[in-house]
């Protein structure tokens, strides 16, 4: 199933238990300005950092390592909102990882915006993420993604991996 990411550039999954572990409502994300939304290790509470590390390892062991045995975790980010830069089709391949998960802590609706869309050679797909949605995304040429503008709370974490596939 995870290898499907190499066909369309994404795989949609659902992991509601991550919300129970993270308890995101207990934390404030400091960085929330356009183009400065990413909150990394030094920007978040120690307990939230530990929880995100656990989830990163969990996702690696459950989804990535069985398909890519030489893979490694790189880093994670967490943010609220959508940067204008991310509203257009793009890849993140300059960031140095091969695949990544997007995990959604909040529910979006068509009328509130905040969708996620994927594009590959001969198709496109768009989703309104709900709390607990998890998307595995290919970070290589030929696959693009974009986020829809929104003014609602839209907290998302990215868990990034190198597959080290030959």
Specify the residue positions occupied by each region the protein language model found:
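Non-heme Fe(II)/2-oxoglutarate
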Residues: 1-69, 75
